[in-house]
A protein has these predicted regions:
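Residue-level hotspots at or immediately adjacent to binding/recognition sites across diverse folds
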Residues: 20-394
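N-terminal export signals
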Residues: 5-21
Length: 394
């Protein structure tokens, strides 16, 4: 695949949603997803059953991130609040959700990355942590020295040694020793963007050589410093302004990177890739007609197309399955604002061809403000919400 096609796949996705004069957009697909009772597909009759939930009277918990490193193994990083203290922890199951073990942490969790059950990393607010014991024991490693104003939000590893750390700021970092030491990716420092306005959001590799990283750069306006739920009328009136979408790509396993910039009204917040295909999840502002949308990516041709866009749903995560199928986890808010602190309803959809979608039955107790998906093995699917709910497809 030519470099210009590789980069065009992702940079075209958010830009295609709304460029130039505003135009009336339609929901995608035009027909509503099939109801669970209408579905006749391969997952018909299966449902998302609650496997773990934090349920205490005097304490509350929120999940920062969730992953499934191996079949039957699920790990949720959470923050427990109550009794005048805050306790970071992970909860782990190694038997498919039949039993769970809680392990206290020494750092507030930000995100997780799992290479497999033997190699698991946790980004904390202060340090990087590593587990070779399914998340049951953690040893301290180092985060890049990027300063408090440029925190690291995520890591990605190709193997137990080679990885990258990224987050706020245009410079991201690389490691060759599993996170013991880090060095800046030199090409990222040369990107012609304002450092304090830039952030990296997602990284994916198609194989051991070809990979991409996505981010954006957008000036922070004064009226955007308050969350929408604190000034809902103002949030709905905000004028949508374009940001700069930035995509980096490598064809040599991260030894070198090249970058492309484009103006877009959306931000790519997550990319999932498998073989020659991928899904990109874009996010828009509160005053936009749609909270976001999902694009299908074809890395062989450089093509992309919208496959899921609904007015009342914000897709947070996606999982690519065998045979070209996909699952989406979305939040339906309780009001008009998607950043409301009031938890919304978890809704899950799947498609075998990315054209027709069917909704799946989800336990009514599953709600939150953010959703996570993980598919550790064929036929095994997990979901979670930040309101401390973990579910498995049964």
């Amino acid at each position: 695949m030519l470099r210009r096609e590789f980069l065009a796949v992702v940079t075209a996705a958010p830009a295609a949603a709304q460029t130039g004069p505003f135009r009336k957009l339609q929901e995608v697909p035009a027909a509503a997803p099939l109801r669970p009772d209408q579905d006749r597909g391969p997952l018909a009759g299966r449902r998302w059953r609650l496997r773990w939930m934090f349920d205490e009277e005097k304490r509350a918990a929120s999940i920062a991130d969730f992953c499934c490193p191996a079949p039957g193994l699920a790990v949720a990083a959470l923050q427990i609040e109550g009794d005048f203290r805050s306790q970071p922890a992970v909860v782990v199951t190694r038997d498919g959700g039949e039993s769970w073990r809680q392990v206290e942490l020494r750092d507030n969790p930000v995100s997780l990355y799992a290479l497999n059950g033997a190699h698991l990393w946790l980004i904390g607010s202060k340090s990087l942590w590593y587990s070779a014991e399914n998340g049951l024991e953690w040893t301290k490693r180092n985060l890049p020295k990027s300063g408090r104003k440029r925190p690291v939000y995520r890591v990605f590893f190709l193997d137990e040694n080679r990885g990258w750390a990224f987050g706020a700021g245009k410079v991201f970092h690389q490691t060759r020793d599993g996170g013991a030491t880090w060095s800046p990716v030199p090409e990222s420092a040369e990107i012609r963007l304002t450092d304090e306005n830039t952030a990296w959001t997602s990284m994916a590799f198609l194989d051991g050589k070809r990979g991409l990283i996505t981010g954006f750069s957008s000036p922070q306006r004064d009226e955007m410093r308050l969350p929408g739920w604190m000034a809902p009328e103002q949030a709905l009136r905000r004028r949508l302004v374009p940001a700069t979408t930035v995509v980096g790509e490598t064809h040599d396993g991260g030894a070198s990177w090249k970058f492309s910039l484009t103006s877009a009204f959306g931000r790519v917040v997550r990319v999932r890739a498998s073989g020659h295909t991928g899904l990109a999840i874009s996010r828009y502002g509160e005053n936009f007609e749609f909270p976001g949308e999902v694009y299908a990516l074809d890395f062989r041709t450089g093509g992309s197309r919208p496959v899921f866009r609904r007015r009342d749903l914000r897709v947070d995560d996606a999982a690519l399955l065998e045979g070209g199928a996909a699952v989406l986890a979305a939040i339906q808010p309780s009001g008009r604002l998607f950043d409301s602190p009031v938890p919304g309803r978890l809704r899950v959809f799947y498609s075998t061809d990315l054209n027709e979608w069917a909704e799946m039955k989800v336990d009514y107790r599953a709600e939150g403000s953010a959703a996570f998906l993980s598919a550790p093995a064929p036929g095994e699917l997990w979901a979670a919400t930040d309101s401390a709910c973990v579910l498995r497809l049964v």
